[in-house]
Amino acid sequence: MADTHHAQGPGKSVLGIGQRIVSIMVEMVETRLRLAVVELEEEKANLFQLLLMLGLTMLFAAFGLMSLMVLIIWAVDPQYRLNAMIATTVVLLLLALIGGIWTLRKSRKSTLLRHTRHELANDRQLLEEESREQ
C-alpha cells in the first residue's frame, strides 16, 4: 500500500498562494500579449489600406492639378500667363505646406496599442492599490 502524503499545514497554504499568484500573473501577461497582437494586426491592416488609398489619392490629385494648371494658363491672356503661373505655384505650395503640417500633427496623435496601454495602466493601478492595503 503506497502511502501518499500530501503536505499539510502552513507550508501547503504558502505554496498554494504562490502558485495561484504565479498562475494569475501568467494569465495576465498572456491576455495582454494577445490584446497587443490583435491590436497590431488591426493597425497593420488599417495602415496598409490607408497607404493604398493615400497613394491613389495623390496620383489622381497630381493629374488633376496638372490638368487644372494647363487650363488656367490657357485661359489667361498671354501677357498675364507668367503672373498666373506664379499665383498657381504659390497657392499649390501653400496647400502642400498646410497639408504637411496637418499630417505631422495627425501622426503625433497616434493611438498604437491604446487599449493595451490602458489595460496595463489598470493592472498597475490595481497592484498599487493591493500593495497599499497590505
Swiss-Prot record:
The keyword Cell membrane applies. One of its GO terms (cellular component) is plasma membrane. Residues 77-83 are periplasmic. Keywords: Cell inner membrane, Cell membrane, Membrane, Transmembrane, Transmembrane helix. It comes from the Bacteria. Pfam families: Phage_holin_3_6. This is Inner membrane protein YqjE. The keyword Cell inner membrane applies. It is a multi-pass membrane protein. It is found in: Cell inner membrane.
